[in-house]
Amino acid sequence: MNNTNTKNSPENAKYMTMLCYTDRKPLGVVKDNPRTKVLSPVLVAKDPEWKPDFHPGGFSAYCANQISQTWLYDGIDEEVQIRVYKTKRGWSMKFHQFVEDCAVHFYDYNF
């Protein structure tokens, strides 16, 4: 899978990304059918190779390289499960939208 910033994640697994305002969270697909999917959160750890580049500004500081952040895969938390549904506008659950075939973890340091 090319749509990921999480290192060492299993290649044969299916993923989705939850869009949370400015942040992104990867989820693994546990159960799958055409109208409903059951997802579990992907556990990630900070990648020691990526260091945020902060500059003075904004509320406290501005992270200039946040778009290049990477994370390390640390498993899937199968105790927590959420159910998402296929709608006219794509995959969703309450107020969140989901992107298929994408495992992106993104923390917005500039929010």
State what each model feature region is.
Residues 1-26, 36-111:
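Mixed-charge, low-complexity intrinsically disordered regions
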